[in-house]
Amino acid sequence: MVRNQILVLDHNYGLWYERRRDDHERVRRRDGDVWGPFYEQPFARSGEGTAWEGLSKYDLNRPNAWYWNRLKQFAEKGAEKGLLLFHENYFQHNILEAGAHWVDCPWRSANNINQTDMPEPVPFAGDKRIFVADMFYDISHPVRREFHRKYIRQCLDNFADDANVVQLISAEFTGPLHFVQFWLDVIGEWEKETGKKATVALSATKDVQDAILNDTQRAKLVDIIDIRYWHYKVDGLYAPEGGKNLAPRQHARKMKVGKVTFDEAYRAVSEYRKKFPEKAVTYYAQNYPDMAWAVFMASGSCPVVPVADEAF
C-alpha cells in the first residue's frame, strides 16, 4: 500500500482464502472439495456437524481468533505507516445476488449450530440468485438480533484501541433504515459502557443517510459521511431507496445511473460538508477516481488525488 501510495484498505471478510467456493460460476457445489487456506470468517468452527463446504459448523457465539488477530495486526502495522482500515462489518453480497456466497455463509442455518432460522432449503431464484437480505436485516427476530448485537460489539472490541480503523456497516450496503439505526444503537451502547470512541462512517443510500443525519442522537455517533450508494448526475439525482432487497448493481439495472462530472461530485461533497461541518465526507460513488480533484476542492477526505510529488 505504501509503495503504491494507497491510503485506505476497504475490507470485508473473508481473508486469504481459496476462492473456488465463491467464484461466481453458475453451478451448485456438490461437496467441499477445497484446498487450504480456507475461507476464514469472523466466527470459529464448532467441531460439531458438517457445514455445506465440508468442515464443521460455525458457532456464532465464538469469534475466530485467527481472523480477528490477523486484522488487528494489519491495523497496527498500518498505523505505523499512516494507513487506514475501513472495516466493513458485513458484506451484503453474501445475502443478495450470487447464491454461491450464501451457501457457505456462517449465518445460513445449515452452516451453524445456533438456530438462526434462515430458510432451508435455500430459496434460490432462477436456480442461482439469492434474496435473503430482508430476513437477514429483520431485527425483530430475537435470535438473529442477539447474534447481530454480539457480532457488532466484537467488531468494536477488536479495534477498540486502533485509531486508524473506521467502522462501516457493510460493503455494498443498500439495506433498510431500521438496521442502520440498530447498528448505531449498539455502537452507542458500547461506547457508553467502555468509555471508548469508535470512528464511524455512515455509508448507506441517500434516504437512509439523510434520515440518520436528521436524527440528533444517532447523528452524534457518526464521524464520517461516506457518499457511495448515490450521486448527483448531470440530469438530476441517482438515489436508490434503501431496504428494497436489491443490491447496488441491481438498482443500477433498473434506474438510469447517469453521467457524473466534476460539478456533480463537488456539489455532493460540498453540500454535506457545509451542512455537517463537524463531520468528514468521503466520496466513493460513480466514477470516483476521476472525481478526486472535485472531492479535494470540496473539502472531502481521502480523495484519490493522482500526485506523485513527495513534497505535495
Language-model features, listed with the residues they occupy:
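Active-site mouth of glycoside hydrolases
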Residues: 1-224
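Extracellular glycoside hydrolase catalytic/binding regions
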Residues: 142-150, 159-312
